[in-house]
Amino acid sequence: ATFDIQNNC
C-alpha cells in the first residue's frame, strides 16, 4: 500500500 503524506497547518 502507498500513502500520501500531507501536512495541513
UniProtKB/Swiss-Prot annotation:
What UniProt keywords apply to this chain's record, in alphabetical order? Answer: Allergen, Disulfide bond, Pathogenesis-related protein, Plant defense
Q: Which GO terms describe its biological process?
A: defense response
Q: What does this protein do?
A: Basic thaumatin-like protein. Does not exhibit beta-1,3-glucanase activity with laminarin as substrate.
What's in the misc comment field? On the 2D-gel the determined pI of this protein is: 9.5, its MW is: 22 kDa.
UniProt similarity note: Belongs to the thaumatin family.
Assembly description? Monomer.
Q: Could you identify this protein by its name?
A: Thaumatin-like protein 2
- Species in which this protein is naturally found: Manilkara zapota
